[in-house]
Amino acid sequence: RFRLPFRRPPIRIHPPPFYPPFRRFL
């Protein structure tokens, strides 16, 4: 009986709001 969050993806996996602008810097 494993309770893995497969149906609901962890919000942590999503990039933060400051992630998109950071890419521009790269």
Swiss-Prot record:
GO terms for biological process: defense response to bacterium; killing of cells of another organism. The keyword Secreted applies. It is found in: Secreted. GO terms for cellular component: extracellular region. Keywords: Amidation, Antibiotic, Antimicrobial, Cytolysis, Hemolysis, Secreted. The modification Leucine amide is found at L26. It comes from the Eukaryota. Leukocytes. Its main location: secreted. The keyword Transport does not apply. Belongs to the cathelicidin family. Has potent antibacterial activity against the Gram-negative bacteria E.coli and P.aeruginosa. Less active against the Gram-positive bacteria S.aureus and L.monocytogenes. Has low hemolytic activity towards human red blood cells. This is Cathelicidin-3.4. It comes from Capra hircus (Goat).
